[in-house]
């Protein structure tokens, strides 16, 4: 008998928005995201893609939002953030389940800390944590988004999956377009 390696299968969902020129990969692992992009390139033959890049430092925008600068229409602050001292090896403050517009947070900002992760909510439909690396974490569709599914046709599991995907992709598209404008994301040269 020859030894056999165990095959581990996995599934990673992704959404291509060719109209707006981005790919959203549902993975917490950068390596998994790169594997998905490799598979897309293999299937299509060529697929030029670059990671997101902002013209303005995301830390300064996130810090401004938590300091009281106006958020883009539709966005509101969540109850979670991470702030870091900009010096190497500086202090890190993590807040969860906390009002972010308060004296305690203001004191950290006055001490020079910058926001590196910030929980945000889009129109009571989607909550997420945006990092200064432009990675969206903890993406969650809220009741406001899922209420729209109650009116969907109940023609079976396939129809429900199609409706869920359509709803989720529309919300992700709205989120991306809002963040693209707010963070001044640069487009790849074509």
Over which residues does each language-model region extend?
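Intrinsically disordered, low-complexity, charge-rich terminal extensions
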Residues: 1-190
């Amino acid at each position: 008998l020859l030894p056999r390696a165990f095959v581990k299968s996995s599934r990673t969902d992704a959404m291509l928005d060719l109209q707006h020129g981005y790919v959203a990969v549902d993975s917490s692992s950068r390596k998994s995201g790169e594997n998905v992009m490799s598979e897309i390139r293999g299937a299509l033959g060529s697929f030029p893609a670059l990671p997101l890049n902002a013209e303005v430092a995301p830390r300064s925008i996130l810090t401004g939002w938590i300091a009281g600068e106006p958020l883009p229409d539709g966005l509101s602050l969540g109850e979670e953030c991470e702030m870091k001292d900009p010096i190497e090896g500086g202090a890190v403050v993590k807040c969860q389940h906390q009002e972010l517009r308060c004296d305690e947070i203001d004191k950290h900002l006055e001490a020079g800390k910058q926001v590196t992760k910030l929980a945000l909510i889009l129109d009571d439909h989607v909550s997420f944590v945006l990092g200064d690396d432009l990675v969206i974490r903890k993406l969650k569709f809220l009741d406001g988004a899922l209420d729209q599914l109650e009116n969907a046709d109940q023609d079976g599991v396939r129809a429900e999956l199609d409706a869920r995907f359509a709803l989720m992709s529309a919300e992700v598209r709205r989120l991306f377009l809002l963040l693209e404008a707010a963070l001044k994301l640069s487009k790849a040269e074509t």
